[in-house]
């Protein structure tokens, strides 16, 4: 067991070691589906007021752990902290999502981009990591569950930086990629350096695993995905600290819509690959043949179904993977703000119960 961790099931699963049951955590597990999160956000005044205050970030990171016996905590933050630190002027408008005051569109904009000083500009994130680690640890120095740090991928960050916010079709960033690949690669190079430095700073502050969210990699065509996303994920992974404080630090990457490229993603040097719900988990396990762990991959909208259906679909995911090491249960994307916390409780219980039955051979 990782030293002083009361529950290291998540870390052992990422390293493909045997576990008594399948660990579970959920993307966006600290979020708007929880009434207590909304209460804390109201006190903070805004999303950025929440994310940039280590006390609030710690409070909301721990909220889902108070409700559910989840096997990992994930830092409460946002993937757009890096471009914000680059001076692009991040703001969240109610009902509109993130917007940048200074999108990166011209040659001059690209020339101005630089890797931010992580401690000077993103010290609130590393401060939150340290504070969360303390909050997860009891008076005897025993930590409840591991803490995950994260970043957006170079390509996904570039999507927001060039578009100036979210997009239905990403035509501005894709147009740049195809018409001025030199500018696109310059942005991606700066982003890759920044992401690696940012994740390493989180690891040094106490993150025990890190995840790269490539939310928009699946928007790219085959070939373009390799050039503009995967190549830069590989660069990031090659620069990461894989051990800290005497313990291995596993790396997860998740490309939404990336099931086509599973084998290539698995070859980037990561320890685990996250999958969305379009991928057959059992077939994916055979495709990677034990080279990496897999994370996923329940369709998050299943949580709107009645509890019996939630449990049935959770069992289907677990049965698909089978009695093999190297599976972390998660959703195929972030949990919806409209999800009932009671249904999440049903899911967590079923994952733990049924995976124990699979291990013991009692699952029918």
Swiss-Prot record:
Intrachain disulfide bonds: none
Enzyme Commission numbers on file: 4.1.1.37
Pfam entry (one): URO-D
The protein's assembly and partners: Homodimer.
HAMAP family linked: URO_D (MF_00218)
Family annotation (PANTHER family): METHYLTETRAHYDROFOLATE:HOMOCYSTEINE METHYLTRANSFERASE RELATED, UROPORPHYRINOGEN DECARBOXYLASE
Annotated protein name in UniProt: Uroporphyrinogen decarboxylase
Species per Swiss-Prot/TrEMBL record: Burkholderia cenocepacia (strain ATCC BAA-245 / DSM 16553 / LMG 16656 / NCTC 13227 / J2315 / CF5610) (Burkholderia cepacia (strain J2315))
């Amino acid at each position: 067991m990782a030293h002083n961790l009361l529950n290291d099931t998540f870390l052992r699963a990422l390293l493909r070691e045997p576990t008594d049951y399948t660990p579970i955590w959920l993307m966006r597990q600290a979020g708007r589906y929880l009434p207590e999160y909304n209460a804390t956000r109201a006190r903070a005044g805004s999303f950025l007021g929440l994310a940039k205050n280590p006390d609030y970030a710690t409070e909301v990171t721990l909220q889902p752990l108070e409700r559910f016996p989840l096997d990992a905590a994930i830092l409460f933050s946002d993937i757009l902290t890096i471009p914000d630190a680059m001076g692009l002027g991040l703001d969240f408008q109610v009902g509109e999502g993130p917007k940048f005051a200074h999108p990166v569109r011209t040659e001059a904009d690209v020339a101005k981009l630089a890797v931010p000083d992580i401690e000077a500009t993103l010290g609130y994130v590393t401060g939150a990591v340290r504070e969360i680690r303390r909050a997860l640890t009891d008076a005897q120095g025993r930590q409840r569950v591991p803490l995950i740090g994260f970043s957006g991928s170079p390509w996904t960050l570039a999507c927001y930086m060039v578009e100036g916010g979210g997009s239905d079709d990403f035509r501005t960033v894709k147009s740049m990629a195809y018409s001025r690949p030199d500018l696109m690669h310059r942005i991606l190079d700066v982003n890759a350096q920044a992401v690696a430095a940012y994740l390493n700073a989180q690891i040094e502050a106490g993150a025990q695993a890190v995840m790269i969210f490539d939310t928009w990699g699946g928007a790219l065509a085959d070939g373009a995905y390799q050039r503009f996303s995967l190549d830069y994920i590989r660069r990031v992974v090659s620069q990461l600290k894989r051990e800290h404080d005497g313990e291995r630090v596993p790396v997860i990457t998740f490309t939404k819509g990336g099931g086509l490229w599973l084998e290539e993603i698995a070859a980037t040097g990561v320890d685990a690959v996250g999958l969305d719900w379009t991928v057959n988990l059992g077939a994916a396990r055979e495709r990677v043949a034990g080279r990496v762990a897999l994370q996923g991959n329940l369709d998050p909208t299943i949580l709107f179904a009645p509890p019996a259906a939630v449990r049935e679909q959770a069992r289907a995911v677990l049965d698909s993977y089978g009695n093999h090491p190297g599976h972390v249960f998660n959703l195929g994307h972030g949990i919806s703000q409209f999800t009932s916390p009671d249904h999440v409780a049903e899911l967590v219980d079923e994952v733990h119960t049924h995976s124990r039955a699979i291990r013991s051979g009692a699952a029918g």
